[in-house]
């Protein structure tokens, strides 16, 4: 008997909560396990389906067996009597070994539902052990997950709300969610709203087929849901990333983070260098300003005392000193108008005479 499912698929968790937690697969599995255990324990005994039983030719033993209050000795007697006709049939059919292995597991008509449950569980355990023993080395499962990229997200949408919206439409299970927080501009200033916004994100599904169907179905459609919902009129912008895995995403994120950090370090070093040059210029300017003030004070003192060298116009010659660059004289071959002729050796003249 199946339990009744909830029909309110469009319920969205409130975004007013302060705790912004992402998806945790372990916590989700634990919560599912607890819920299944609680349902199994709270289910009434009349809803449990009884196990199949084999009809056996057993003689009735009094009316005490109807109320189910017989003793253990009576049950044992019934079991022995029920096994006798079975053994006779086994001998006639020639399958004694197989039936003997099954006879201690078969429940009698007087057995309780708890006993039948234990026998079924033991049989399943035997099957699982034999299957694992036959295949000791199982091949590892391939990574068949699919990733969808969201180029834009509705404002103030939390990861848990995004997961609930996708699962409510039948696209699951979702294993991982990663959303990039949007960077606020400096011109916006400080705002009282503490809710976070996300610019883009990635969602990993347990199946590639589910991810493809989700991207093809929901792309360029409105979020929908309740008429007065916060995200009713927003549009989905998603794309299935073929051949893209979650490890590639983490590698890309780390690479971009390293690039931004390296760029920031270069900018900081450049800013520090410019700051040093500026401070050196300021200090040098202060030194020159102090020298100029001292010279002005000295000029005032000389004017007041009437001392100092006086130049043209009666001004005190305390200006900047005139620098003279001394030039080296160029040596000339001619001296006193007489040009010195260079003498040529006799050997050289003889060789030149033979050539020319």
Swiss-Prot record:
Keywords: Nucleus, Ribosome biogenesis, RNA-binding, rRNA processing. The keyword Transmembrane helix does not apply. GO terms for molecular function: RNA binding. Residues 13-23, 72-103 have a biased composition (Acidic residues). Disulfide bonds: none annotated. InterPro entries: ABT1/Esf2, ABT1/ESF2_RRM, Nucleotide-bd_a/b_plait_sf, RBD_domain_sf. It comes from the Eukaryota. Residues 146-235 form the RRM domain. One of its GO terms (cellular component) is nucleolus. The keyword Hydrolase does not apply. Residues 46-56 have a biased composition (Basic residues). GO terms for biological process: endonucleolytic cleavage in 5'-ETS of tricistronic rRNA transcript (SSU-rRNA, 5.8S rRNA, LSU-rRNA); endonucleolytic cleavage in ITS1 to separate SSU-rRNA from 5.8S rRNA and LSU-rRNA from tricistronic rRNA transcript (SSU-rRNA, 5.8S rRNA, LSU-rRNA); endonucleolytic cleavage to generate mature 5'-end of SSU-rRNA from (SSU-rRNA, 5.8S rRNA, LSU-rRNA); small-subunit processome assembly. It is found in: Nucleus, Nucleolus. Residues 108-134 have a biased composition (Low complexity). Residues 34-43 have a biased composition (Polar residues). Gene3D superfamilies: 3.30.70.330. CDD domains: RRM_ABT1_like. Residues 1-141, 298-318 are annotated as: Disordered. Involved in the small subunit (SSU) processome assembly and function, and in the 18S rRNA synthesis. Required for the early cleavages at sites A0, A1 and A2. PANTHER family: ACTIVATOR OF BASAL TRANSCRIPTION 1. Belongs to the ESF2/ABP1 family. This is Pre-rRNA-processing protein ESF2. It comes from Coccidioides immitis (strain RS). The gene is ESF2.
């Amino acid at each position: 008997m199946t339990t009744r499912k909830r029909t309110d698929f469009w319920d969205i968790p409130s975004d007013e909560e302060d705790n912004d937690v992402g998806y945790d697969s372990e916590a989700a599995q634990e919560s599912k396990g607890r819920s299944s255990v609680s349902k199994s324990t709270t289910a009434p005994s009349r809803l449990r389906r009884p196990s199949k039983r084999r009809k056996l030719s057993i003689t009735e033993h009094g009316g005490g067996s109807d109320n189910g209050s017989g003793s253990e000795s009576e049950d044992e007697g019934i079991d022995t009597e029920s096994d006798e006709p079975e053994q006779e049939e086994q001998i006639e059919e020639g399958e004694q070994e197989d039936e003997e292995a099954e006879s201690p597991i078969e429940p009698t008509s007087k057995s309780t539902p708890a006993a039948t449950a234990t026998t079924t569980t033991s049989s399943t355990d035997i099957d699982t052990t034999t299957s694992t023993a036959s295949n000791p080395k199982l091949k590892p499962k391939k990574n068949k997950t699919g990733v969808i990229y969201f180029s834009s997200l509705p404002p103030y949408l939390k990861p848990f709300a995004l997961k609930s919206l996708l699962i409510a439409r039948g696209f699951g299970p979702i294993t991982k969610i990663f959303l990039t927080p949007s960077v606020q501009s400096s011109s916006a200033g400080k705002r009282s709203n503490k809710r976070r916004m996300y610019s883009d994100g990635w969602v990993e599904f347990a199946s590639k087929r589910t991810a493809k169907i989700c991207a093809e179905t929901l792309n360029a459609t409105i979020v929908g849901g309740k008429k007065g919902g916060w995200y009713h009129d927003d549009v989905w912008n998603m794309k299935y990333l073929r051949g893209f895995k979650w490890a590639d995403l983490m590698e890309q994120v780390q690479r971009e983070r390293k690039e931004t950090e390296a760029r920031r370090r270069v900018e900081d070093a450049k800013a520090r260098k410019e700051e040093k040059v500026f401070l050196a210029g300021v200090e040098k300017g202060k030194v020159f300003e102090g020298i100029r003030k001292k010279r002005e004070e000295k000029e005032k003192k000389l004017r007041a005392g009437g001392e100092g060298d006086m130049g043209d116009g009666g001004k005190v010659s305390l200006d900047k000193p005139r620098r003279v660059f001394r030039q080296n004289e160029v040596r000339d071959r001619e001296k006193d108008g007489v040009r010195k002729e260079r003498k040529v050796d006799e050997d050289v003249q003889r060789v030149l005479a033979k050539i020319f």
